[in-house]
């Protein structure tokens, strides 16, 4: 894809992120097929049917136990309705409570699910501004993607 298309799909990922009710970090993902068709979207949030209460969202430990990451959500959303993910490109982007936009490889758990879903490429904003507490996990996830021959690129 061209930078123009990549930017368009990253913008859609950021729009999806805006749907998240997480008060600290909003992450969005868009899955795109080989013909530039959007196959699905996702954002970080609680599972269907689980109430997004202020108590749960503001209790970090509880929130992290309930939260479905955006990358996983888009894969599950596609699986739920039978949309193929094999050979697709996953775009994801995050914003934090200060308005910074960041990216990098997904977390390791999401990277493994991306590999298992047959996704061919991951595109995100630059790694350099990802929160420090995610750095080690993001670096290892990049290794997982590379070893599994999943393309990864950052769009600056």
Can you say where each PLM-predicted feature lies in the sequence?
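Short, basic/aromatic recognition patches
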Residues: 1-25
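Short beta-strand scaffold segments in enzyme catalytic cores
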Residues: 26-40
């Amino acid at each position: 894809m061209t930078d123009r298309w990549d930017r368009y799909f990253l913008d859609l990922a950021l729009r999806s992120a805006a749907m998240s009710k997480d008060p600290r970090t909003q992450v969005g993902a868009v899955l795109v097929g080989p013909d530039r068709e959007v196959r699905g979207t996702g954002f970080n949030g609680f599972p269907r049917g689980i109430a997004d209460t202020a108590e749960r969202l503001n209790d970090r430990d509880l929130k992290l136990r309930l939260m479905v990451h955006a990358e996983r959500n888009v894969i599950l959303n596609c699986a739920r309705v039978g949309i193929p993910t094999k050979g697709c490109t996953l775009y994801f982007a995050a914003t934090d409570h200060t308005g910074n936009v960041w990216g990098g490889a997904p977390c390791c758990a999401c990277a493994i699910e991306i590999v298992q879903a047959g996704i061919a490429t991951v595109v995100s904003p630059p790694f350099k501004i990802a929160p420090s507490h995610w750095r080690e996990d993001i670096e290892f996830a990049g290794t997982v993607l590379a070893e599994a021959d999943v393309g990864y690129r950052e769009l600056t």
